[in-house]
Swiss-Prot record:
HAMAP family hit by this protein: ATP_synth_epsil_bac
Organism: Pisum sativum (Garden pea)
GO molecular function terms listed in the Swiss-Prot or TrEMBL record: hydrolase activity; proton-transporting ATP synthase activity, rotational mechanism
Gene Ontology CC annotations of this record: mitochondrial inner membrane; proton-transporting ATP synthase complex
Protein name, per record: ATP synthase subunit delta', mitochondrial
Family as reported in the entry's similarity comment: Belongs to the ATPase epsilon chain family.
Keywords: ATP synthesis, CF(1), Hydrogen ion transport, Hydrolase, Ion transport, Membrane, Mitochondrion, Mitochondrion inner membrane, Transit peptide, Transport
Subunit text: F-type ATPases have 2 components, CF(1) - the catalytic core - and CF(0) - the membrane proton channel. CF(1) has five subunits: alpha(3), beta(3), gamma(1), delta(1), epsilon(1). CF(0) has three main subunits: a, b and c.
Transit peptide, residues from-to: 1-19
Function description: Mitochondrial membrane ATP synthase (F(1)F(0) ATP synthase or Complex V) produces ATP from ADP in the presence of a proton gradient across the membrane which is generated by electron transport complexes of the respiratory chain. F-type ATPases consist of two structural domains, F(1) - containing the extramembraneous catalytic core, and F(0) - containing the membrane proton channel, linked together by a central stalk and a peripheral stalk. During catalysis, ATP turnover in the catalytic domain of F(1) is coupled via a rotary mechanism of the central stalk subunits to proton translocation.
Transmembrane segments: none
Length: 197
């Protein structure tokens, strides 16, 4: 009995919608709209999830020559659809170089230097944290909580902050104070290595 029910259900499900991006999905379910109009003719039917779906961007058949980068902060956009040669991104799993045609991935950013290579020009940003999304169509979306061009960092302030957080860590009595001081040390150490390296 169960076997018959599942085979009937699966045959109906596969007949209604296939797993393919080439097949267009119907915008609305016509039987649902007809049933809705019978029950409440004066109210427009609600939008169904199928109406909110967008088609996937096409995956190119050849590897593109450029990587499109969107680098966004909560208050501004550093790079919007900028075509570059490569990007080196600091992630919690390690630094990752991204070239055109890279496999689709998602990762969390860690404090470090984001390097954007465009021809012979190299631009470096210090990012505090965030996420990066690499799409199959050679688009990289980088969302950072805070980012500063490395050439705008003040070496003296970084050294002062590193000393201050080291003192706070040594004098901390609670776990919260220790963790806050450790985060400050991690960020200032990454800032210091960005300036020296």
């Amino acid at each position: 009995m169960f076997r018959r029910a599942t085979s009937t259900f699966l045959s109906r499900a596969s007949a209604t919608r296939r797993f393919s991006t080439d097949v267009a999905t119907p915008a609305t379910n016509s039987s649902f709209v007809e049933a809705w109009r019978k029950v409440s003719p004066n109210i427009d039917p609600p939008k169904t999830p199928l109406e909110f779906l967008k088609t996937r961007p096409p995956v190119p058949s050849t590897i593109p020559t450029k990587l499109t980068v969107n680098f966004v902060l909560p208050y501004s956009s550093q790079l919007a659809a900028k075509e570059v040669d490569s990007v080196i991104i600091p992630a919690t799993t390690g630094e990752m170089g991204v070239l055109p045609g890279h496999v689709a991935t998602i990762a969390e950013l860690k404090p470090g230097v984001l390097t954007v290579q465009e021809g012979t020009d190299t631009t470096k940003y210090f990012v505090s944290s965030g996420f990066r999304f690499i799409h199959a169509n050679s688009v990289a979306d980088i969302i950072a909580v805070e980012a500063v061009p490395v050439n705008q960092l003040d070496r003296d302030l970084v050294q002062k902050g590193l000393q201050e957080f080291t003192q706070k860590l040594n004098s901390a009595t609670t776990d919260l104070e220790k963790r806050e001081a450790q985060i400050g040390i991690d960020v200032d150490s990454a800032l210091n290595s960005a300036l020296t390296g």
